[in-house]
């Protein structure tokens, strides 16, 4: 029998549940989703087909060339984490061949959870389950295709006997990972299945693959790494394998092993902004912040080209400010990452470009993400703007409750601007307001743990700089020593929730006090050079501010007084610094009062 193509969305197509989804990379790890993708994308027009997504293909059982082409487009978008585009490509493929087993499998895959969205909207779960059940009723299915459908089906079981929804989802994830583990052993030479197996394992505990020293956190991580690396030996240009390889390796002690593959990824799918961005996860971890910025700048421009294409397409595009996860999540993640990378180079032009792009990327109304990103914008200003320019920046408009994090960040930037102008009264007034806004933030949003930690850092840095301005840098040192420990306790996020090491500011105050050896030690700690077992989450490798601080400390100590080892360290810091701030060319913001 042939399964009816019918209405993919079913009777619940326009229902929406819960709060707005938060993309983990731009929000809190483990955040919950909101709107069912099948509802958001219900009225999306037929997809264009000229997205420059490369040549990844998986031959499926169909006699229709358009179905095959659209299936491949869905697979490429799935590998690029644009699940909405993946979903509409698979729907279009199924429309052309109602007997296509893999088209139904693809629809179900695109409606599932992923490492950046941990829950499963009930509407999406039901539609995915029905798609897979219908696929199993299709006669003469290819054995491997049927096996993929059977492996995916546990991901969408209802499990009504389990009272808690999060526990139901954990059970689904575990059962799916078990099924994909078995399938990966059955088809060891299929790169798509190896990718899906690694993805299933990673979804068991998203972003918790390695401990804070870079060792595997769970027993199932090494086999997943082996599967991806084995697949890459024969399929080095498989965009899915490379994408998941970056994610599964970035938190390890050896992110550099991914670099040769990461370097090639943007050219494999130049029209997929998220894949153009992905190498920066490795470049950032290995301390190559110029390349990290460049990757994210290119990714941002790639996404903007994509938006123009879909917005100009049939039906007027797919921009839905109420829940388009890609546009309001992944796109702005590129810009955030570009800004975080640019800050660590001290490049004024790059920081200005990214900060301006981030500010102009708003447009969905005030949400958690909007508040967070406006806060990031304000936090960046002291690194490249003059005090006068910062003081001219208006605070967020609208209700204070909507902008708690952004308002704290604005207060913080105001304090530092007044300090640099040596305006003690202005700094004190801004700090009093900062304190008030931090208290309100804690009282109203108790669950935003990392936001509270970042707010505490802003208080500490502002307090220390005021102490320094008032001639009591030693008091500021004590404040920052405590704050550095608090930053060490923050969870992994990429880029880090607080974009620079507190230790660089601590070093600036130590240099001011003439404690050059202490400053050098602190700066090496910020770079992760002091201890090979240092917590990977607390290291900012390749940070230009640290190299600048090292050169300042050594020069004030007296070049003629350096030991051979110190001279070697000084020369190395100058060499790295020259990469970010060459004698002629880029405008460089690196200075002790900005650190």
Regions found by a protein language model. Name each.
Residues 2-245, 253-255, 263, 267-269, ...:
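N-terminal alpha-helical interaction modules that lie
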Residues 262-263, 270, 274, 280-285, ...:
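Catalytic cores of extracellular degradative/oxidative enzymes
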């Amino acid at each position: 029998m042939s399964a009816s193509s019918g209405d993919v969305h079913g009777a619940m197509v326009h229902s929406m549940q819960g709060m707005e989804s938060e993309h983990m990379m731009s929000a809190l790890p483990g955040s919950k989703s909101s709107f069912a993708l099948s509802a958001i994308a219900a009225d999306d027009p037929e997809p264009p087909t000229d997205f420059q997504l490369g040549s990844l293909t998986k031959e499926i059982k169909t006699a229709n060339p358009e179905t095959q082409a659209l299936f491949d487009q869905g697979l490429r978008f799935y590998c690029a984490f644009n699940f909405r585009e993946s979903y509409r490509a698979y729907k279009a493929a199924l429309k052309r061949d109602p007997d296509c087993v893999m088209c139904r499998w693809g629809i179900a895959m695109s409606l599932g959870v992923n490492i950046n969205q941990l829950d499963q909207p009930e509407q999406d779960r039901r539609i995915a389950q029905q798609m897979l059940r219908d696929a199993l009723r299709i006669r003469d299915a290819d054995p491997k295709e049927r096996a993929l459908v059977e492996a995916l089906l546990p991901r969408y079981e209802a499990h009504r006997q389990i009272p808690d929804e999060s526990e139901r989802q954990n059970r689904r994830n575990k059962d799916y990972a078990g099924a994909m583990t078995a399938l990966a052993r059955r088809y060891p030479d299929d790169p798509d299945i190896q990718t899906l197996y690694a993805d299933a394992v990673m979804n068991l505990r998203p972003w918790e693959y390695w401990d804070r020293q870079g060792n595997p956190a769970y027993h199932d991580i090494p086999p997943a790494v082996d599967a991806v690396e084995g697949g890459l030996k024969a399929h080095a240009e498989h965009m899915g394998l490379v994408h998941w390889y970056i994610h599964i390796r970035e938190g390890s002690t050896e992110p550099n092993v991914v670099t040769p593959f990461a370097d090639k990824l943007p050219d494999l799918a130049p029209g997929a902004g998220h894949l153009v961005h992905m190498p920066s996860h490795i470049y950032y971890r290995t301390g190559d912040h110029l390349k990290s910025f460049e990757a994210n700048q290119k990714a941002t421009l790639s996404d903007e080209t994509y938006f123009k294409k879909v917005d100009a397409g049939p039906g007027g595009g797919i921009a839905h400010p109420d829940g388009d996860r890609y546009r309001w999540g992944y796109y702005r993640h590129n810009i955030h990452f570009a800004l975080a990378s640019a800050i660590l180079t001290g490049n004024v032009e790059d920081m200005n470009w990214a900060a301006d792009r981030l500010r102009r990327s708003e447009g969905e109304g005030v949400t958690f993400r909007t508040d967070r990103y406006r806060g990031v914008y304000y936090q960046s200003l002291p690194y490249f703007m003059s005090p006068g320019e910062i003081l001219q920046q208006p605070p967020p408009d609208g209700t204070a409750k909507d902008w708690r994090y952004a308002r704290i960040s604005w207060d913080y930037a105001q304090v530092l601007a007044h300090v640099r102008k040596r305006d003690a009264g202005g700094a004190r007034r801004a700090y009093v307001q900062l304190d008030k806004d931090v208290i309100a933030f804690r009282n109203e949003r108790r669950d935003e743990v990392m936001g509270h930690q970042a707010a505490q850092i802003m208080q500490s840095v502002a307090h220390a700089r005021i102490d320094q301005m008032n001639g009591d840098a030693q008091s500021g040192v004590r404040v920052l020593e405590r704050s550095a420990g608090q930053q060490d306790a923050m969870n992994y996020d990429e880029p880090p929730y607080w974009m620079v090491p507190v230790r660089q500011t601590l070093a600036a105050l130590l240099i001011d006090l003439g404690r050059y050896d202490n400053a050098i030690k602190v700066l090496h700690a910020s770079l992760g050079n002091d201890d090979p077992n240092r917590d990977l989450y607390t290291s900012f490798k390749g940070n230009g501010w640290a190299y600048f601080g090292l050169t300042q400390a050594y020069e004030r100590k007296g070049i003629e007084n350096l030991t051979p080892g110190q001279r070697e360290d000084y020369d190395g810091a100058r060499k790295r610094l020259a990469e970010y701030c060459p004698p002629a060319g880029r405008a460089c913001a690196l200075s002790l009062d900005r650190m």
